[in-house]
Structure formats: C-alpha cells, structure tokens
Amino acid sequence: MATEKNTLLSLILTAGITALVATGQKAEQPEVVTNYGSVRGYQVKVNAAERSVNVFLGLPFAKPPVGPLRFSEPQPPEPWKGVRDAASYPPMCLQDKVLGQYLSDAITNRKEKVRLQISEDCLYLNVYTPVSTEEQEKLPVFVWIHGGGLVSGAASSYDGSALAAFDNVVVVTIQYRLGIAGYFSTGDKHARGNWGYLDQVAALQWIQENIIHFRGDPGSVTIFGESAGGVSVSALVLSPLAKGLFHKAISESGTAVRILFTEQPEEQAQRIAAAAGCEKSSSAALVECLREKTEAEMEQITLKMPPMFISASLDGVFFPKSPRQLLSEKVINAVPYIIGVNNCEFGWILPRMMKFPEFTEGLEKDVARQVLQSTLALSFKGAPSDIVDLVYNEYIGVAENRAQVRDGLLDSIADPLFVFSAVEVARHHRDAGNPVYFYEFQHRPSSAAGVVPEFVKADHADEIAFVFGKPFLAGNATEEEAKLSRTVMKYWTNFARNGNPNGEGLVHWPQYDMDERYLEIDLTQKAAKKLKERKMEFWMQLTEQIMSDRRRKHTDL
C-alpha cells in the first residue's frame, strides 16, 4: 500500500505539482480585528500553489445556543476583550459522535484525520484567506455548508486552504445546529423549528459584517454545499430571510424538494418525545421538558433515533410556504445557480449508513422489493403499493441476475432522491429566468480501489475531494486526478467571480436551457443534454400521478 501511494505521489510530482502537504507550521500568527474582537490564527503554506494561507478556526458567529436558547433563534455573539485564539478546531454540533467521526474521516480532504469533539456550543465558523504582500482588491468569498442529513457533520472536516491558495478566494466553512437541537418542531409557536437553517442565515449575516476584515468581498458571496449542505443552499435560495446575503449558489447532490422537508413535523416531535420520556399534553410542556435535558441526555436521545430521523419543516418564517410552492410560484432569490449530481449517488456510503442488507454480490428480487418499499417513503411519503409496483417494474422487473437487481435498486433510490430532484429545481430556476449550470460528476476516485466495490462509479460525496483540492493536501491521487481537481476548482471559482463557470483552457459548460444541456465531469469533460431523459420522464409522470391522487383524496374529504 505504501509503495502504491509513493508511486502515485511521484506521478503527481513529475507533473510539476510539488510538495502536496500544507505544512501546518505556525511560523506566522496573523491577527485580525473583527466587529466583536481580535482573533489570532496561523499560517500554512500550500506548496503546490506556491502561496500561504491565513487560517482562523472557531470564530463565534452567535451566542452558544444552550439553556433557554435551545430551540430559539440564534443571537449575536458577545464581544470579547483581548485577542481570541483561533488556532483550534471548534467542536462539532450535537450528534452521534461515532457516525460524525466516520463521516469526517471518509470525506476530509486532509492528509491527517482530525479528532472532533461534540458540544451544543458549536456555532462557529472557520476562515481561510490567501496571503498577499501587496494590497489587493477584495476577494470573492466561498461559504461551505457541510452535509450529513441534517443530523451529522462538521465544518472542520473540510480544509479550505488549497481552494483559497490556488484561486485567490476567501473560503469560510460554517456549522449549524443538527438533529433535535437543529430541527425539532412542534408545528406551532412553541418550537417553530428550522433552527439550523436560521443558524446558517446568522453565519451569512456575520460574514456580511466581518468578512471585509479578512480581505473578503461581502458583495461577492457564493454559498455551496453537498448533500444536506446542497439542500441547505437550495433552501437559502428560497428563503426571504437570506435575501441579499449571498450572490451565487452551488448545490452538490442535494436540493430542497422531496428530501429533508416535512409539512407534518408533529409526527417527528412525537417520536422524539417518546425517546426522551417527554410525552406531554401540550407543545409548551414538551418543549420545556426537552429544554431541561442535559447535553449528555440529548446525545443519548439522538442515539435512540434512526439514521435519518428529522427534517426541516414549514415554519412560516424561514419557509413562508413549502419549497415546492415557493419554486412553482417563482418566489426565488434571483442568483446564478450551479446544480449537479454524481452518477452513482446511492452506490456505497449511503446504503451502508442506512444499514442496507448485504448487497455487494447482488440481491434477490424479493429483498430488493422490500428495501424499495421502505426507501421510497423518503421521496414519497406514504407511497401506495401500486407506486411501488410501477417503480419496481421500471428499474428491477427486467433484471436478469442478482447484480442487475442490485444496480436497479440503487438507481431506483438515487434517481428520485437526487437526480430528479436536482432536475426539477434546475427547471424551476431556469423558467424563473435565472442562469443555471448543471453537471453530472462521473469520476471514480483511484483511492476507492480495494475499498469501494468496482460497480460503484462516482459515489455520493466523491466530488468534494476535487472541489477542495485534496490531491494537493493529502496526495493519494494520480496526475490526471490532480488535473481534474484544478479543473473543477477553476469552474467553481470562475462561477464565484463572474456567475459563469467558463474560462480560458476549460471545456465549454453550456447554460441549462430548454434543451437541458449540462456538463459531464470526468478526467475529460464534455457537454451533453437531457440527463437520464427517459427516467426523468418516468418520475415526472409518477409525481404528477401521486399529486393528482392526493388532491382527489383531499377533495373527497
């Protein structure tokens, strides 16, 4: 294994990309005065980019959301005197610590693994800003929103130094309350919910007020995120609370329709109440009971819940109407938008997290049908058996062996959760007159060899390594992958600067139009159109049928 790694490193070195590791030496201790007080960070050298980056970790953008502030809107942070140390990673928000660490280790773009603590006091952000010896214009700002199903994840899993160094941008990674602390709702005034989304708005407000001190341009902010982070970006594009706080948006493998949203949060609240021993006769009493739980008790309640146990909800504040209604009524923050998916979204990491039956060698049809029935509920709540039949016949019915059954099942889950949802949102934004660029990421990382089964192509989250320049920080990549990473970083940063990803030396990325043109991103890139056209038509018709059935039932009542 070590020999293979050395070979890969030498391949990259011979391509003229030197010393892949940001040194981490704290030779320089940069200080910045923010609106709340002074902070002292440290400097790293990204040798491959021949540039240093100033790093500031754990900057508070809100008061700790503890005690009476649990299930409350975030409040501005308290100012401090003296110089605050900003050289240590903040704790990640309350979550299943084992799952959170597993996800962090799986997706980090660093060479080393960062051991993360958990705490309810977690509303912090990290800033990476390139060093310059001369006064320059203000730099575009990237704000990364991590994924993790709204129940796990951490800002510190993502090192923004390579992106900042190579492309002369400021990178901010933010945290937000997760799980019960982040999205618990009683569906009324006692706990409206969406606390995590309100935290994201608070972080963006802090950035508007303070990023100028880090050479960032508050008038050029691009929000981007993956999975639940992509859903969050999509939600912020729809929320009136976020209007004017950002200027471009990128959703990677996640949009705010069909997943991680409910119009009936009371059902979630009842399950949480039962797990917490807080089954009360009123919403007010339930909220008070949960507020009295210690942090350790909240962690134990979280561990009793299934993997994807909570969603954002219709609160009348962050979401005045459902995401689908806001989209259809074109009530959208008008910004250029990149939306994309990977070509094997439900290939490996998500089925494992959701404790799928062993599927590596294939599946029997009866097992696949049972799994399909349970997972369809993620996309279509209360899907009747005839809907299950239609999806089964479309994806699995014609399969001739266990491997084809497995592949059909995985696609039947990925397509509605990720692909069709992304296409739907892209169409709405296009029709509202906003510039949209769509992609499908197709590259299976070389680091997957011997770890991820060969049938998995570009799995959920695989693109993150290339967006954040992992080949230049962690190595373990081929020369072609280093080139791909630079290509993706250039597309993203061109978009942040100009609202258009295209630039010199890049394959032309067409705007998403009525021909639904998009970019296939692999070791080489090419334009294509109408991603999965037949399957998308299938899901469009099925969605219309389900909504028509619901309207008819509602009318009958």
From Swiss-Prot:
Expression sites (tissue/organ): Highest levels in uropygial gland, much lower in liver and kidney.
Assigned keywords, A-Z: Disulfide bond, Fatty acid biosynthesis, Fatty acid metabolism, Glycoprotein, Hydrolase, Lipid biosynthesis, Lipid metabolism, Signal
Protein name, UniProt field: Fatty acyl-CoA hydrolase precursor, medium chain
Enzyme Commission code: 3.1.2.-
InterPro entries per the UniProt record, alphabetical: AB_hydrolase_fold (IPR029058), CarbesteraseB (IPR002018), Carboxylesterase_B_AS (IPR019826), Carboxylesterase_B_CS (IPR019819), Type-B_Carboxylest/Lipase (IPR050309)
MF GO annotations: hydrolase activity
Role, per record: Fatty acid biosynthesis chain termination and release of the free fatty acid product is achieved by hydrolysis of the thio ester by a thioesterase. This thioesterase may be associated with peroxisome proliferation and may play a role in the production of 3-hydroxy fatty acid diester pheromones.
UniProt-annotated catalytic positions: 227 (acyl-ester intermediate), 345 (charge relay system), 460 (charge relay system)
Glycosylation (residues): 476
Entry-linked CDD domains: Esterase_lipase
Organism annotation: Anas platyrhynchos (Mallard)
Signal peptide start-end: 1-25
PANTHER family noted in UniProt: CARBOXYLESTERASE
Entry keyword annotation includes Signal: yes
Family: Belongs to the type-B carboxylesterase/lipase family.
